[in-house]
């Protein structure tokens, strides 16, 4: 019927399933039919064709796969057009809208996106639909098939073994203390990795230029850093690669690499390879291997970062001699880098005790007890000073002691995923056992740190026991909540409260869907369980004013 229908027919993708509700879509489907057009939903045609793969994005959701197939179907029919509905603030659709647009553009089709919110005035929508109809009729009359071959695939430049020798690998900033140490660890393995340390307002503007503005703030920051570095002229585009972590979870972070590849293409650097740093086998990168020695050094770097972070925030808040803590911190950063380069296990172990003992000598003025404020939230925003508007510095200036969670805790949380999958879904017991063993090895690595901190008189927060944290949240939410920071974010808040830190700032990017559930969504329940809890959620985005935060 579609092939024989009149040229005025239009295919309208109904958005997400709930967009079929007239109370939500404000009667847009009725408006379309009133213009003499037919309406089809994406699920009515998605089974007719398959989208060409591999796609630029990670196609991990059934609904998203239907969208891409529906867009492909529309591309095959001259008398069909597509209208995509999405809800205002639906960050997940920042991934789908770009990909659907690319598919349609490859067939010479106009992409129309209509954002749905509580406003029900359809005047502007009527104009957009009429414009779409006029464009379709004009295209049909012209019968111009140039460049409409449906080629929307992306040419992924692979980082080869040969590239390892002379390529510079650019890494975006996330956690300044930890990533400076991880840069050293990567260099010892033969990778010429350069950490992009600085972020400015220009970085944000660059990110906004090349990334869908509905994507989350961290994706805008990291992409902006990379493109800004390439445009600076410091790096040869023919000898440069980029690296980005990829968790494989449901968070948009899994698609950061897709965002980056699109930005590279749009900025004129399509031949720069992007390395996926992951341990779940998402992308094969011949020139980058996570060997056991490299993993061990990376974990040591994270442990050093966690320990130095504790030393810095605790002692800086109370030091008698201003600047003494920072000077000692800088000294130990260099020592830790040297041990990561050339040290052995014995030197690493001894350095843990030496760090704590050295910082123990710093005299503190504890005549006035300062309120402790814990920072939790999305993993980049809580550590990245520019990303959170330097909230730690602000709190210290206001007379608070800042407490930041261990980065290693997040790594252990990620390792629990396969264990949870197996316990709830009976997936793969062997992988679950391997994950448990990995967590046990990390606990062994942290043993000296726990012991050294336990001997200190300065009340440091010890490294977390991930299984204990998991148990603390089971009466609040399911441990099946693994997207983004998942149940671990809730557990971090409870851990702080149980350690006498009831004042908590929960930071997240604007429209971070996981944090709506495991962050903001559990605050009321936590307050009911812990009446002394003082939790304040703060959103960050490229345009948020500091005064609002």
Label each region the model flagged.
Residues 294-348:
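Long, well-ordered, tryptophan-enriched scaffold segments
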Residues 1-7:
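Single conserved hydrophobic/aromatic residue that forms the stacking wall/gate
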Residues 75, 86-160, 165-169, 261, ...:
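Peripheral docking tails and interdomain loops at the edges
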Residues 29-30, 37-69, 435-490:
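Active-site rim loops that border cofactor/substrate pockets in soluble metabolic enzymes
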Residues 12, 18-20, 365-369, 374-453:
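Extended, H/D-rich, highly charged conserved domains that either
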């Amino acid at each position: 019927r579609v092939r024989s229908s009149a040229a005025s027919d239009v295919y309208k993708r109904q958005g997400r399933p709930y967009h079929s509700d007239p109370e939500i879509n404000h009667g847009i489907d009725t408006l379309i039919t009133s213009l003499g057009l037919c309406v089809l939903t994406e699920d009515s045609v998605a089974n007719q064709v398959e989208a060409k793969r591999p796609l630029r994005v990670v196609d991990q959701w059934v609904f998203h796969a239907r969208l891409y197939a529906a867009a492909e179907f529309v591309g095959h029919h001259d008398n069909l057009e597509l209208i995509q509905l999405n809800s205002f603030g639906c960050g997940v659709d920042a991934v789908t809208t770009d990909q659907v647009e690319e598919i349609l553009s490859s067939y010479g089709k106009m992409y129309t996106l209509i954002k749905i919110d509580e406003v029900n005035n359809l005047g502007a929508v009527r104009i957009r639909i009429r414009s779409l109809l006029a464009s379709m009729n004009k295209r049909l009359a012209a019968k111009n098939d140039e460049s409409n071959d449906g080629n929307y695939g992306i040419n992924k430049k692979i980082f080869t073994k040969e590239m390892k020798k002379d390529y510079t690998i650019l890494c975006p900033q996330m956690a300044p203390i930890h990533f400076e140490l991880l840069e050293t660890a990567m260099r010892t393995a033969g990778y010429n990795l350069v950490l992009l340390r600085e972020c400015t307002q220009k970085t944000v503007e660059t990110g906004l230029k090349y990334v869908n503005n509905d994507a989350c703030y961290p994706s805008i920051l990291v992409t902006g850093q990379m493109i800004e570095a390439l445009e600076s002229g410091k790096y040869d585009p023919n000898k440069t690669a980029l690296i980005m972590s990829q968790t494989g979870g449901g968070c948009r972070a899994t698609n950061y690499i897709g965002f980056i590849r699109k930005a590279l293409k749009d900025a004129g650097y399509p031949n720069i390879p992007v390395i996926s740093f992951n341990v779940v086998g998402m992308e094969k990168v011949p020139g980058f291997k996570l060997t056991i020695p490299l993993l061990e050094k990376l974990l040591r770097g994270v442990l050093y970062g966690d320990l130095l972070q504790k030393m810095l925030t605790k002692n800086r808040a109370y030091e008698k001699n201003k600047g003494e803590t920072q000077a000692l911190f800088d000294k130990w950063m260099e020592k830790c880098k040297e041990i990561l380069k050339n040290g052995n296990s014995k030197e690493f172990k001894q350095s843990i005790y030496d760090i704590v003992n050295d910082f123990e000598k710093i005299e503190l003025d504890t005549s006035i007890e300062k309120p402790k404020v814990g920072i939790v939230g999305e993993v980049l925003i809580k550590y990245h000073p520019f990303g959170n508007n330097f909230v730690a510095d602000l709190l210290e200036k206001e007379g608070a002691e800042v407490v930041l969670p261990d980065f290693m805790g997040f790594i252990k949380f990620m390792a629990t995923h396969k264990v949870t999958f197996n316990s709830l879904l009976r997936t793969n017991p062997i992988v679950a056992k391997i994950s448990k063993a990995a967590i046990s090895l990390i606990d062994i690595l942290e043993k000296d740190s726990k012991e050294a901190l336990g001997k200190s008189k300065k009340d440091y927060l010890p490294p977390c026991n991930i299984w204990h944290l998991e148990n603390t949240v089971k009466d609040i939410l399911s441990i099946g909540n693994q997207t983004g920071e998942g149940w671990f974010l809730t557990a971090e808040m409870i851990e702080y409260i149980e350690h006498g830190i009831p004042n908590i700032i929960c930071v997240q990017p604007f429209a971070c869907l996981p944090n709506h559930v495991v962050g903001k969504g559990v605050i009321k329940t936590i307050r009911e369980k812990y009446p002394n809890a003082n939790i304040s959620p703060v959103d960050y985005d490229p345009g948020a004013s500091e005064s609002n935060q």
